[in-house]
Amino acid sequence: MIQTESRLQVADNTGASEVLCIKVLGGSKRRYASIGDVIKVSVKSAAPRGRVKKGDIYNAVVVRTAKGVRRPDGSLIKFDANAAVLLNAKLEPIGTRIFGPVTRELRTEKFMKIVSLAPEVI
């Protein structure tokens, strides 16, 4: 469950290591984002020679949350930390690699590229 001012780890190789959620996209009254939701983020810390730099604003998709996601069979998938993958304006991933597991909830037409790059799909 991600809201404005939430800090997330970055699960790709763009060079960013931490981002801050500045807006949950999808309606003016929308407060929380979960796995598979698109948010607007600001880069808070980045590697010196990465693709992105500190202060840049990007779209991102949430790939892991500590709150978890409930499956129809009743199981709950939780992670140790919140993580996101940075996206460009066309909602395509900026990075070429994804680190760590992602959930099956990302298997929509929009994010199949992220699922195919991920080392593990839970």
Curated annotation (Swiss-Prot):
UniProtKB keywords: Ribonucleoprotein, Ribosomal protein, RNA-binding, rRNA-binding
Pfam family, one: Ribosomal_L14
PROSITE patterns noted in UniProt: RIBOSOMAL_L14
GO biological process, one term: translation
Source organism, top-level taxon: Bacteria
Any one GO molecular function term: structural constituent of ribosome
A GO cellular-component term linked to this record: cytosolic large ribosomal subunit
Record-linked Gene3D superfamilies: Ribosomal protein L14 (2.40.150.20)
The keyword Lyase belongs to this UniProt entry's keyword annotation: no
NCBIfam families in the record: rplN_bact
HAMAP family: Ribosomal_uL14
Family as reported in the entry's similarity comment: Belongs to the universal ribosomal protein uL14 family.
PANTHER family per the UniProt record, alphabetical: 50S/60S RIBOSOMAL PROTEIN L14/L23, LARGE RIBOSOMAL SUBUNIT PROTEIN UL14M
Quaternary organization: Part of the 50S ribosomal subunit. Forms a cluster with proteins L3 and L19. In the 70S ribosome, L14 and L19 interact and together make contacts with the 16S rRNA in bridges B5 and B8.
UniProt name for this protein: Large ribosomal subunit protein uL14
Lineage of the species this protein comes from: Bacteria, Pseudomonadati, Pseudomonadota, Betaproteobacteria, Burkholderiales
